[in-house]
């Protein structure tokens, strides 16, 4: 689907991100598709460690998601940055904004691959971002975290050392 859209030069947009997330979550319950919403009082939306059950990451509030996605879309569609940098930023921002209840990582990997393909840097059958990131999942997650606190509003919205993520991403 994405390769065909890249050939048609479909612009990077919030609608495209939502369409891809719906494909990623095909067969999931309706509440898992689309932007995440408000949590019930007393509940916190967070990414939890599967073993310890501790909150590893607390993304931005649901009400900030539309504006954050709009800013990302505007950046992608107006920047003169190198496509590899744009793809790295798309990946980081989608994982960090965490706009969906589920499928954020898969959607981020697909959308960063879309940016690369659309701008002439596709993999053309020699591998994929999924394979690269799965090769050493621990390093992937550590690079994304960049040693920052778990709370989005405590530095992840504007990381002081993005070169940690760029270095990892650009080694692919």
Which residues are covered by each model-predicted region?
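FIC/Doc superfamily catalytic core
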Residues: 1-172
């Amino acid at each position: 689907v994405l390769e065909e859209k890249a050939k048609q030069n479909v612009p990077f947009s919030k609608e495209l991100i939502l369409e891809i997330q719906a494909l990623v979550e095909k067969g999931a319950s309706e509440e898992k598709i689309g932007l995440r919403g408000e949590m019930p009082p007393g509940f916190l939306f967070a990414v939890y460690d599967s073993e310890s059950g501790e909150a590893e990451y607390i993304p931005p509030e649901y009400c900030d998601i539309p504006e954050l996605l709009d800013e990302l879309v505007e950046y992608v569609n107006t920047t003169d940055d190198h496509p590899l940098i744009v793809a790295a930023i798309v990946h980081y921002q989608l994982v960090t904004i965490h706009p969906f209840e589920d499928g954020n990582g898969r959607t981020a990997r697909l959308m960063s691959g879309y940016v690369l393909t659309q701008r002439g840097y596709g993999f053309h059958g020699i591998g994929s971002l999924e394979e690269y990131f799965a090769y050493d999942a621990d390093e992937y997650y550590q690079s994304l975290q960049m040693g920052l606190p778990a709370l989005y509003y405590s530095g992840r919205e504007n990381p002081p050392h993005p070169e940690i993520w760029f270095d990892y991403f650009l080694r692919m």
